[in-house]
Amino acid sequence: MDTLLEVDRLTKVFSLGGILSRVRIRAVDNVSFYVKPAEIFALAGESGCGKTTTARMILGFEEPTSGAIVHRGGQGGESENKKVWFTEGVQAIFQDPFGTFNPLRIVDRYFFETIGNFGLAANGKEAVKLIEEKLNAVGLSYDEFSGKYPSEFSGGQLQRISIARALLTDPTLLIADEPVSMVDASLRMSIVNLFKKLKEESGLSVLYITHDLATAYYVSDRIAIMFRGNIVEMGPVERVLMDPQHPYTRLLRESIPEADPKKRWGSRITLSNTEHEEYLRAGCKFAGRCPDATETCKSQVPQDVHIDDVLVKCHKYHSVMKDTSSSHCLA
């Protein structure tokens, strides 16, 4: 199988507290997934699930405790041994478009600096032509961009500018960490539609990190659902979100707002102040919230089970698969 990015058993452990009360939290726990060329892969889950920490390790901002990251593609060749550096092949955009740019600098300077750092143009004329090309790709023009400060743009425009800057190096992989969460609702679809356009027209792959299942469903080819450092379900987005197998995925799915003025958003999702406890749980980390939890769930870590093209980390399906295999043996 042709893959662009492979994450293999990635783990990140943080030590919290003082010397006498130090606790080790596995913020990312044995996470594995891959991204194919010309694919949008979503890494989704609620705040604190470990998705951003995973992205930071892929980008080299955090050192993994263990595991491997391999990026294939780009002029840097194959990068491994736990880090993928910012090269021509891998670029990123982040949650806050206003925090990306210094308010006292015109945005042009960021583009010219990137071009200079990577040697992307022989002279100023070539640089301007390259900037125009990338701005046009995200629906902007050089005239409306040149000489302006970040405060002169809307959040949606700044996020498009961030994407255009990332495209300067012709990356094969774009890591987008909550790229629409701080953009007006009316502009969110324009950003996710841009990802789809770039995938279809230039073969760009996107690792789309989000808590928003609605945009994940719309834009992604495959999706992984994270909970307390674990991937609990992964597969084609249509299968995972329209017919969720893991109890946590079902809970997230039910929390998506409906066209009902009497129903408050999130009224079905039960969130408690147990994040710390869930990270330290001996068995399944979701057992404290799960309506199907058994004593086994509370004491033993579930293994990955493959149901057709969907991966599920749940004792319920592990026992079902054992029963099925036993019946086949008897037959």
Residue ranges and their predicted role:
Residues 44-46:
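The feature captures the beta-strand-to-loop junction immediately N-terminal to the Walker
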Residues 149-153, 157:
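Conserved ABC ATPase signature
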Residues 59:
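Helix-to-loop junction immediately C-terminal to a conserved catalytic motif
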Residues 236-331:
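Charged, flexible cofactor/metal-binding loops and thiol motifs
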Residues 67-78, 86:
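Conserved ABC transporter NBD signature motif
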Residues 168-172:
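A short, proline-enriched helix->beta-strand linker immediately N-terminal to the Walker B motif
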Residues 183, 187-262:
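P-loop NTP-binding/switch modules centered on Walker-like glycine-rich loops
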